[in-house]
Amino acid sequence: MGKTKIRSIDLFAGCGGLMDGFEQSGAFDTIAAVEWEKVPCKNLENRLREKWQYQDAEERVLRFDIQRTEELFKGWENDQEYGSSVGLDQLIENARGIDVVIGGPPCQAYSIAGRVRDEFGMKNDYRNYLFESYIKVLELFKPTAFIFENVPGILSAKPGDRPIIDIIQESFDETG
């Protein structure tokens, strides 16, 4: 009898690089991968199906705006941009829970290169706060563990009067 795999979801999945690392271990079962860009989602579906042998890859990849968390959880129908999906609640219920959340929000607002290129140093960039959607996923699904990755520039990014890393750390601490 085989070992039970660790059930994971990947947020801000991009083309699936982080997910691939977890899948390569052989210990993880990717329940869902959330990404809002069309081309990376097609790549994710292909990787899950062809490389990792998930026959239901299209259902596991949720192409949606993670900031619309209520719909992301409950599902959506006939959205002009994103079509229809059952949402994370149903996928996670079908998997009988979730063990790990992996992912990291887009790095442009945190990276030193991104801040140098922007005349306001990315202080007004909404991506500074996409971690809040990650927190909502943690609060609702209560995984045993999470992996939140990003660029080294996150340690010095300061969109307001406080370093963003302090705000993120406090949010994680409050979540438990």
Task: Give the location of each predicted region.
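Conserved active-site and SAM-binding loop architecture
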Residues: 1-176
